[in-house]
């Protein structure tokens, strides 16, 4: 599925799993294709300017692991940004992510980058500027990968 959204979703998901469980090394060979490239870049260059997902995994839980896995991280350099990867694997249903951020830091806004079944191009998908008490709800279209930066 290197040139299909299913491949992009699977690769994004496995990279999140590897980070969550501290996999030290994994290899891949062959042509990456458009969606596999996007899966790597959603972690390594989500804004086209070299910005990266954090290097310290933080707790992220979902009540629907089958359809909407979630991964989260922060940066060790203390820059304060929280990163969240949310995937909607569902072929035909929009997902509603009820995001409740724990910890002692207050977040009031975030920017969303992602790709979907329509295009492997990672692009800015929107912003949320009304986060209240570290909680908000986000609609995620079918077959979509979001990288949310707080």
What are these regions (language model features)?
Residues 65-106, 146-149:
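Carbohydrate-binding surface patches
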Residues 59, 64-66, 78, 93, ...:
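Ser/Thr- and Asn-enriched, surface-exposed coil loops between beta-strands
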């Amino acid at each position: 599925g290197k040139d299909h959204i299913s491949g992009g979703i699977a690769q994004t998901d496995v990279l999140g799993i590897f980070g969550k469980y501290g996999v030290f090394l994994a290899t891949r060979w062959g042509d990456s294709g458009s969606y596999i490239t996007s899966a790597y870049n959603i972690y390594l260059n989500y804004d086209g300017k070299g910005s990266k997902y954090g290097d310290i995994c933080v707790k992220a839980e979902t009540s629907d692991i089958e359809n909407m896995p979630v991964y989260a991280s922060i940066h060790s350099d203390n820059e304060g940004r929280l990163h969240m990867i949310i995937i909607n694997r569902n072929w035909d249903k929009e997902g509603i992510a009820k995001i409740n951020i724990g910890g002692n830091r207050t977040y009031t806004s975030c920017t969303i980058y992602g790709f979907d079944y329509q295009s492997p191009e990672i692009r800015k998908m929107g912003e949320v500027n009304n986060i209240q008490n570290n909680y908000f709800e986000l609609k995620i279209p079918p077959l979509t990968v979001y990288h949310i930066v707080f």
